Amino acid sequence: MMKSQKKLLIKIIVVQCLLVLCVTSQDFDFFYFVQQWPASYCDTRRSCCYPTTGKPDEDFSIHGLWPNYKDGKWPQNCDRESSLDESEFSDLISTMEKNWPSLACPSSDGLKFWSHEWLKHGTCSALNQHAYFQTALDFKTKSNLLQNLNNAGIKPRNGDYYGVESIKKAIEKGVGHTPFIECNVDSQGNHQLYQVYLCVDSSASKFIDCPIFPHGGKCGSKIEFPSFSTNDDHDEF
């Protein structure tokens, strides 16, 4: 009797483990890969602080790689026991400092930001820490947003305004898929290019057409693409 109960218990545990693995690996439909324009983060009323590693380049930076459902909802914090382990991705840190900096105040080295992204989104991705961060870095290189915009004559310059559809078409031409453009408002009340959303398949292997676009962050027909190249010797923008 005890043996049969023991076997049954083992079977239940195995099934539960398999179910957990299944949910972890399949319980979302696609990723949003989100990049932000640093000038548009910094010139709002809340301002920003440059990382301890120095002012970032004038280029789009990674915000995150976020698992999502086709109904617009998303999973988050899928493993509350997880914690960021710097040793797991130590070979990526210098590249992440350049391409995935934190502009939040107070100034930081990025670890707090990366930890937030990993715990909230990465733990739902079915990727380990190294693969999660490496994948996001790879998609930034593939998307090449700034170059695609420059190729269309869309360059960061204060006071110039561009059509949102022109921005979308320039990115679509380079990436092959239509992005979602999120805007915010600068300290003078001007709408500006803030974040670009592209969609990635659930295996994190390629860009795809977005099953659904986010809500919020709507833009006018023309928006500013502010410069981030002005010299500034202060830590706070």
From Swiss-Prot:
Listed GO MF terms: ribonuclease T2 activity; RNA binding; RNA endonuclease activity
Q: What's this protein's family per the entry?
A: Belongs to the RNase T2 family.
Write down what this protein is called: Intracellular ribonuclease LX
Q: Which Gene3D superfamilies match?
A: Ribonuclease T2-like
> Which cysteine-cysteine pairs are annotated as disulfide bonds in the entry?
C42-C48, C78-C124, C183-C219, C199-C210
Which catalytic reaction applies to this protein?
A: a ribonucleotidyl-ribonucleotide-RNA + H2O = a 3'-end 3'-phospho-ribonucleotide-RNA + a 5'-end dephospho-ribonucleoside-RNA + H(+)
Q: Is Disulfide bond among the key words of this record?
A: yes
